[in-house]
Amino acid sequence: MKSILENRPELAYEVNQAAEVAGYLWQKGWAERNGGNITLNITEYVDDEIRALPAISEVKQIGKVLPYLKACYFYCKGTQMRMRDLARWPMANGSIIRILDDCASYVIIADQPVMPTSELPSHLAVHNYLLEKGSPYRASLHTHPIELIAMTHNKKFLEKDVAKIGRASCRER
């Protein structure tokens, strides 16, 4: 079976960019084994042939209606897949999904029926928000940095003063 990426250089480039990011996360120790998720909106690279592809999975419920995602397509990291493997073989460790017309469900259309991670509804909600606001951003990513996880298991790092310093260093505040 040929890959959906064949003869689609722009789509292949975007999926390979996500794979490259997965590689960086793995190499830098910023992703704990299979922890984390990458979801990429690829709708602008979808052609009529892709739109006509049949589902290769059952219909899956998102759990919420996301109206801005109608007829959108996403590349998603698969559940229990490692970032290092996604970096080498993105279509064996992820899949392409189509959001259905009800805006509350999706199907996998390529290349293999690799189920997205459990964080997919959260990522899709982020994409829905980005589209609603007219944002040019097309990727949603989260991960579990190994060292940060290790720190949360150390009593010293759970003490009030150290935790306060850690929170103060976050730019998001």
Task: Give the positions of each predicted feature.
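Glycine-rich flexible loops
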Residues: 1-173
